[in-house]
Amino acid sequence: MILIADSGSTKTEWLLVGKQGIERTFRTSGINPYFLGEEEIRRVLTREVLVELPIERITDVYFYGAGCIGLPGEMLCLQLHRVIGPDTVEVNSVLIGAARALFGDKAGIVAILGTGSNSGFYDGRDIILQTPSLGFILGDEGSGSDLGKHLLSDAMK
């Protein structure tokens, strides 16, 4: 079985894929390794993720999330290996996750709106050209906060 995660700081959406296709989906607390330490991540994985998994062994985990570049992503990868125990763990950015979902192994331009919005060119394997995200303070175009700000601003004019 394959476990796929799409995570931000607030929530993580999980998808369990078996031989017949999608088996189930579930949601847990967000896992952003830039802000969470090893113990906090291990706690979410053991208390919220493991209880949702079937008895059948998970062979592969693909985790796409905020804060997953560099050392924080490596630490998350280690925790996923330790807690879930799959053969393969891959931890990548949400932009790679969106690109793979949209294009598979074909090239294309991918963009994410919301907290930490960004965009890039995907060559079918990697993001090779990327607009850097300005984070949730300056780069939240399309997020709930941004849309609410525009709505209130327009209503008060």
Feature map (PLM): residue ranges:
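Short glycine-aspartate micro-motif
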Residues: 2-6, 60-62, 90, 108-112
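Short glycine-rich, Thr/Ser-proximal phosphate-binding strand/loop in the N-terminal lobe
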Residues: 2-43, 56-57, 127-128, 133-134
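Short beta-strand scaffold segments in enzyme catalytic cores
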Residues: 12-17, 100, 111, 117-122
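Short beta-strand-loop/turn "lid" adjacent to the catalytic site in phosphate-handling enzymes
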Residues: 49-91, 102-103
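Active-site phosphate-binding/coordination module
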Residues: 78-81, 121-122, 127
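Active-site glycine-centered loops adjacent to acidic/histidine catalytic or metal-binding residues
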Residues: 94, 114
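Helical "lid/coupling" subdomains associated with nucleotide-phosphate turnover
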Residues: 96-97, 102
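Glycine-rich phosphate-binding loop plus the immediately following alpha-helix
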Residues: 127-157
